[in-house]
């Protein structure tokens, strides 16, 4: 991935993020990593000037997205995840970059996924809310989909100790404002 004109990310995006056995470092850019190395996708979604946040059971806010299914490309996965987690359809997509991930687990999260090194592609886009989240079995249960001003979103994710996600929303808003 190349840094090809995106604004310099803030310090909250420079830190390594650890989730379970995976360390992830955000690499800004507008060039996709090779498809065979993409294991996950996330979107900072907007409806007009408001950001969209989903909350899962227990109240934790999340950025919509998830793991690619066998044979699925990242855009198909993104569309599926938006239906499942936000009851939404994708209208536009702009790449922000990707997390370069390394897992110390002995096996991949799922057999079809790249391992031990892979990418979590992240972008932003406009969505249309068309219904309730489908909440398929085996996934996180989304209990709320909310539209919020960006300052509220940032505060919310910081409260939940996720300054990295707050920074992704902030970066997406900054790029949208300059377009």
Language-model-derived ranges and their functions:
Residues 1-42:
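Acidic, metal-coordinating catalytic segment for phosphate/diphosphate chemistry
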Residues 27-29, 37, 74, 79, ...:
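Short acidic (Asp/Glu) patches
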Residues 38-40, 56-58, 63, 116-120:
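Short connector loops at helix/strand junctions that flank enzyme active sites
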Residues 43, 95, 123-125:
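A structural signal for short, well-ordered beta-strand segments
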Residues 46-85:
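Conserved Nudix-box catalytic region and its N-terminal flanking loop in Nudix hydrolases
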Residues 89-99:
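A short coil-to-beta-strand element that immediately follows conserved catalytic motifs
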Residues 101-133:
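Active-site-adjacent beta-strand/loop module that shapes the phosphate/pyrophosphate-binding cleft
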Residues 121-126, 134-167:
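NUDIX/MutT-family hydrolases
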């Amino acid at each position: 991935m190349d840094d090809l004109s995106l604004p310099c990310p803030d310090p909250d995006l420079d830190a390594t993020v650890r989730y379970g056995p995976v360390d992830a470092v955000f690499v800004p850019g507008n060039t996709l990593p090779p498809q065979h190395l993409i294991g996950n996708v996330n979107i900072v979604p907007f409806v007009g000037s408001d950001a969209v946040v989903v909350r899962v059971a227990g109240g934790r806010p999340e950025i919509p997205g998830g793991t690619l299914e066998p044979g699925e490309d990242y855009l198909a996965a993104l569309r599926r995840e938006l239906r499942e987690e936000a009851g939404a359809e994708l209208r536009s997509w702009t790449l922000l970059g990707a997390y370069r991930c390394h897992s110390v687990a002995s096996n991949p999260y799922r057999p079809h996924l790249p391992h031990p090194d892979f990418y979590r592609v992240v972008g932003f886009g406009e969505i249309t809310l068309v219904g309730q989240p489908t909440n398929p079995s085996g996934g996180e249960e989304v209990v709320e989909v909310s539209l919020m001003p960006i300052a509220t979103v940032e505060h919310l994710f910081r409260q939940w100790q996720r300054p990295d996600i707050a920074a992704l929303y902030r970066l997406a808003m900054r790029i949208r404002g300059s377009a």
